[in-house]
Swiss-Prot record:
Belongs to the glycosyltransferase 1 family. Bacterial/plant glycogen synthase subfamily. Keywords: Glycogen biosynthesis, Glycosyltransferase, Transferase. Synthesizes alpha-1,4-glucan chains using ADP-glucose. It holds the Pfam family Glyco_trans_1_4. This is Glycogen synthase. One of its GO terms (biological process) is glycogen biosynthetic process. Pathway: Glycan biosynthesis; glycogen biosynthesis.
Length: 488
């Protein structure tokens, strides 16, 4: 049996998703699988997952997770997902909840215990299956202990001796930081509790565990890999990242064009592509249908419509957008906001919708189908993030011919060619400032109004950009090759 790359993740679309992590892990392993890499995924069995939906079945009953003081077990379910095995760790007391990590009261009190258990269960499952993986690929703090377990266990257990690990940081701001007393129950040896290990200002830091002990560390864009080495974006972990800099790689995420592609999008009233003989008539029909669906003024069909999709939190810069709405309304544009998050931002967005009814629509929440229609029906996509490790929605916007206006940070810098370059695919501004954001939007609006041919050329260039997972997969193949495994 060929040894596998095994992804360990707390989310994987379509089985679970709270944001970009779910999207990425729904696409990346599958892309590698289709490139010939033996690949599987281990993820929790959350309460909302229905076994009948994807042919999920019980494959291992009472898998012993390996706490020496407590014979705790879990059940392992399995699904064949497009020819790739996905394993689900099931233990109701930890994962049978309405939400993944928190509810309206805040983070779940036992998150540390939950994801210690998940990481140990993943390792126990692999031991039970009997074939050591080639690469264990962990993602964010929820699986950060996996590289740490591997680091220490392969020193004494021949089963793990030739396995290597990768830790991918999708967002450094979320670290899994917990009280020091919880380290005692995690199963790592005392020597892991150091400044160069899992200890962080007296706390137990699960993401730091992965960074400290993985053989390779990746982030989701080259620019973000550079940014997190300094205090502005390092979130307190710039020290350990500088120590591990030789092992740190920035690999741009991909977009799943099997799902996000206007030429085959099942959620759109009209499909279209960059080379359609009717030009962008299909996109214009999508715009008219979206205005009707959301109760916006029909005359906006002849004015720029600006779309925002994202969490209504400071990181995404929603406050910058809300600050400048009155100025945007002076330019007779439409604005659509889709997302949820900070209650104050939600309330403010809804208040603005009342003030500018017919020209601004705010939908608190998220539905996948509406997100697709907003991408297709908007003329300009807004992404004023204060930081952005990679970002996926701007990649989707490019494919849908909706030039973005975005902050020049992280993956936004790596994916958008800014106007006025002759190869421009969008517009960027230098820092999180409402006036700079407004000026960039007004540049885009002016261009839309006064240079139809140039705007359509920009749309066409945007739609032809290749941010596929096949492209990203080649970079991961090279990374695995550096670890000693050639899957080509």
């Amino acid at each position: 049996m060929r040894r596998e790359v095994v992804f360990v993740t707390s989310e994987m679309y379509p089985f679970s998703k709270s944001g970009g992590l779910g999207d990425v892990l729904g696409a990346q392993p599958l892309a590698l699988h289709r490139m010939g890499v033996p690949t599987s995924v281990i993820t929790p069995f959350y309460g909302r997952l229905r076994t009948a939906d994807y042919g999920i079945h019980l494959t291992v009953s009472d898998c012993h997770v390996g706490y020496p003081w407590d014979p705790i077990t879990c059940d392992i379910y399995e699904a064949d997902y497009h020819g790739m095995k996905v394993y689900f760790v099931h233990r109701g007391e930890y994962f049978d909840r309405r939400y993944y990590y928190n509810d309206h009261k805040g983070d779940y009190f036992d998150n540390c215990e939950r994801f210690i258990f998940f990481c140990r269960a993943a390792m126990a499952l692999l031991r039970r299956l009997g074939t050591p993986p080639a690469v264990l690929h962990a993602n964010d703090w929820q699986s950060g202990l996996v590289p740490a377990y591997l680091h220490f266990w392969r020193q004494t257990d021949p089963f793990w001796a030739d396995t290597r690990s990768v830790m991918t940081i999708h967002n450094l701001a979320f670290q899994g930081r917990f009280a020091s007393r919880l380290f005692t129950g995690c199963g790592l040896p005392p020597q892991a509790w150091t400044m160069s290990g899992v200890e962080f200002w007296g706390d137990f830091n699960l993401l730091k565990a992965g960074i400290a002990y993985a053989d390779m560390v990746t982030t989701v864009s080259p620019s973000y890999a550079r940014e997190i080495l300094g205090p502005a974006y390092g979130c307190g972990l710039e020290g350990i990242l500088q120590v591990r800099q030789h092992a740190l790689h920035g690999i741009l995420n991909g977009a799943d064009y099997g799902i996000w592609n206007p030429a085959q999008d099942k959620f759109l009233p009209c499909r279209y592509g960059p080379d359609d003989p009717q030009g962008f008539a299909g996109k214009q029909r999508c715009k008219a249908a979206l205005l009707d669906e959301l109760g916006l003024a029909p005359e906006l069909a002849h004015r720029p419509v600006l779309g925002f999709i994202g969490r209504l939190r400071g990181q995404k810069g929603i406050d910058l957008l809300l600050d400048i709405v009155p100025r945007l309304m002076e330019r007779n544009v439409g604005v659509i906001i889709l997302g949820e998050g900070n209650l104050a931002h939600e309330a403010r967005a809804l208040d603005l919708m009342e003030t500018y009814r017919g020209r601004l629509c705010a939908i608190v929440g998220y539905t996948e189908d509406l997100a697709h229609r907003i991408q297709a029906g908007s003329d300009i996509f807004l992404m004023p993030s204060r930081y952005e490790p990679c970002g996926l929605t701007q990649m989707y916007a490019l494919r849908y011919g909706t030039p973005p206006v975005a902050t020049a940070v992280g993956g936004l810098r790596d994916t958008i060619v800014p106007w006025p370059s002759p190869e421009a695919t969008g517009f960027t501004f230098g820092r999180s400032d409402p006036q700079l954001f407004l000026e960039a939007i007004l540049d885009a609006v002016h261009y839309w109004e006064h240079d139809t041919e140039g705007w359509r050329a920009m749309m066409t260039r945007a739609m032809h950009q290749d941010f596929s997972w096949e492209r990203a997969g080649r970079s991961y193949l090279n990374l695995y090759r550096q670890l000693g495994f050639d899957f080509s």
